[in-house]
Amino acid sequence: MVVKITDKMKFSRSFDYVDNGIEHGVLSKFEPKEILLKKGTLIAEGFKPLDCDIKMLKDVPVKLRDGVTIYTDIYLPNNCKKVPTLIAWSPYGKSAGTAPRYKNLFNMLGMGNAWNSGLTKFEAPDPSYWCAHGYAVCNPDMRGIAHSEGNTTMVGSQEAQDGYDLIEWIASQEWSNSKTALTGTSYLAFSQWYIAAEQPPHLTCINPTEGLSDGYRDLAFIGGIPDKNFIERLQVNHVSAKGAKRENLVKEMDCYPLATAEVWKDKVADTSKITVPAFVIASYSNTLHTMGTFRSWRNLGSKEKWLRIHDKQEWPYYYDKDNVEELRRFFDYYLLDKDNGWNKTSQVRYSLIDFQGNNTNDISTGTFPPSETSNTKYFFNPLTRTLQDNAGKTDVVLRYDTQSLPGKISFQKTFDKKTTFVDYPKLKLYMEVENYNVESQRKTRHGVKRI
């Protein structure tokens, strides 16, 4: 008997779906139809007018390989040309650009909402801009989201197969030039690793902007430490669906604490299987996505790949006007066959962070880490609380109380000349818990104890 990975997952009832045209955006009510949105239209107060006429195909059904039907919104230039498609895969609601929760979020960040048209799915490309430049934008509700059938899973092979099916469906449509790309930040980035690894024939290129690639190591047990808080918030942000179930990662953390569990192994992206061109965006400061983005970049099977390491938060970076223009050069080259010189772009560009605010950006190099860097080891000096070049000759025990301030031990290093840190930092620690009875066990993957 073949056991599907979904049989191993733990599910809970989805949250109730509110279909009032407000909670999930002004265009969220279920109304399968074609709408002509005229240039200059204001989708909602506080957003910018549309850049061009857009044909909106609303709540279009797409049948997946197992018979489940999902629904997607598709935005097209209002002409008869065949166009490439940008796909934004996520569980956050295909029409939620004007939802109060996201309007408030971007206001809180100081970005406001006038940078987009209101058609923009959370963390996704703005259809107004891309339709004006000859692209279609596909905003699907994945299975178990809003009116899409089935139960929602989070990260892994089920989503990857569904994304594959959507890509191949798009390629068969009369308005499609058969070329597609995946783009977006965060969830819309890490879903790309999984979908692209399935190698859909009509996926042309990808643009992951900061995305984890291992559901266990990057999300649930970061550094081996359980982190249920963010997962709970992530699951709450999933748009719900009436009568559906959602995968409950918190329950799975309790049931499957080891990375060897099938559920967690299914959530590891094999980016070596990705062969399409990739424009990968990373940063040093995203505790959720940094490790997975760099790991994926290193392991990518793509022969044509670019890495840009920026000095901002992912959303201001992704929606910055100049960065959008550069992304269009990448897509124009592969999706519209424009000979715009993108292939001559430096394979790696990185930033240097200066704590006085004088950051240096877009330093070009052929590899990352840059070939001119050298790995340097530093050792703790427990007596001076500094870092030194050589290991000490005597062992010294340092203690701190986790229940009182400062709750940490710090070490400093003062450099006598200008020094730049570029590369993946590594730290090896030896720690011991005192005055506790500790029981050590080792288990096989089948749960058999070995003492």
Say what each PLM segment does.
Residues 30-40, 104:
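Short beta-strand/loop turn elements enriched in aromatics
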